[in-house]
């Protein structure tokens, strides 16, 4: 399993300036279970980065709607979603290998067979590997908010990224985001609302209630106990 996890930095007009990390590498130590999963399940479920577009029908061995999740953490909710929807295909991207190992272990334990994972920079994967008009859903749950003003430019949700996602979605496909940082939710709403081709699925033209399809994470449950809010945004590709 290879790692090269660099994301572009954007200027105030959304143009790439140089390549820096849009996240902090917190690899930590692998547990024995995670190491075992990477050694034994990665050859079956893992996808190495390639400069060539992936053929989803070949990868999954069938034609089915594809959901891409960016930054799946330890993979608990991703595995739960894949298990609950065996008729769909799921591809997860996470840059931290302990999370990838945990996800592989969980998927194996749950008998999930409609899930593949990658350990690489999602922006580069989108550019190089994901065919245009190929995804039914893109999920981005609780990305790093980079709450300090000087770090806001590191936020993954910027106009160029949202436009890139738009190009990978099928017509009618949905970009689903969630954050527990209100300022980031407002930023996401501003970015997404500025792009022609997206339609906000919120009846009030801002946020949507958490759909049942998105499991509540332990992180989110802890936030609820502390009185923290969570904002879900869902935008459909309409052109």
From Swiss-Prot:
Domain of life: Bacteria
UniProt keyword annotations, A-Z: Methyltransferase, S-adenosyl-L-methionine, Transferase, tRNA processing
Residue numbers spanned by region Interaction with RNA: 150-155
Pathway assignment: tRNA modification; N(7)-methylguanine-tRNA biosynthesis
Gene3D superfamilies: Vaccinia Virus protein VP39
UniProt GO cellular component terms: tRNA methyltransferase complex
Residue positions binding substrate: 148, 180, 217-220
EC number: 2.1.1.33
One Gene Ontology MF term: tRNA (guanine(46)-N7)-methyltransferase activity
Residue sites binding S-adenosyl-L-methionine per the record: 69, 94, 121, 144
Catalytic activity entry: guanosine(46) in tRNA + S-adenosyl-L-methionine = N(7)-methylguanosine(46) in tRNA + S-adenosyl-L-homocysteine
Active site (UniProt): 144
Family affiliation: Belongs to the class I-like SAM-binding methyltransferase superfamily. TrmB family.
Role, per record: Catalyzes the formation of N(7)-methylguanine at position 46 (m7G46) in tRNA.
Assembly: Monomer.
Protein name per Swiss-Prot or TrEMBL: tRNA (guanine-N(7)-)-methyltransferase
Organism of this sequence: Salmonella typhi
Highest classification ranks of the organism: Bacteria, Pseudomonadati, Pseudomonadota, Gammaproteobacteria, Enterobacterales
């Amino acid at each position: 399993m290879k790692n090269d996890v660099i994301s572009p930095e954007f200027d105030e007009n959304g143009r790439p300036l140089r390549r820096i990390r849009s996240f902090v590498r917190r690899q930590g130590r692998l547990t024995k279970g995670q190491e075992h999963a990477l050694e034994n399940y990665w050859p079956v479920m893992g996808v190495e980065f390639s400069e060539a577009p992936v053929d989803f029908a070949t990868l999954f061995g069938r034609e089915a709607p594809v959901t891409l999740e960016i930054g799946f953490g330890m993979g608990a909710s991703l595995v739960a979603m894949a298990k609950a929807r065996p008729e769909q295909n799921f591809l997860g991207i996470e840059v931290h290998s302990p999370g990838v190992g945990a996800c592989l272990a969980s998927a194996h334990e749950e008998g999930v067979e409609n899930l593949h994972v990658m350990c690489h920079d999602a922006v580069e994967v989108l550019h190089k590997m994901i065919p245009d008009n190929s995804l039914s859903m893109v999920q981005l749950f609780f990305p790093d908010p980079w709450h300090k003003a000087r770090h806001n430019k590191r936020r993954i949700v910027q106009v160029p990224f949202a436009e890139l996602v738009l190009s990978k979605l099928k017509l009618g496909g949905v970009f689903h985001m969630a954050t527990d940082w209100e300022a980031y939710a407002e930023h996401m709403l501003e970015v997404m609302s500025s792009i022609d081709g997206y339609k906000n699925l919120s009846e009030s033209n801002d946020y949507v209630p958490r759909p049942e399809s998105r499991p509540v994470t332990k992180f989110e449950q802890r936030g609820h106990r502390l009185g923290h809010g969570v904002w879900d945004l869902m935008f459909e590709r309409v052109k």
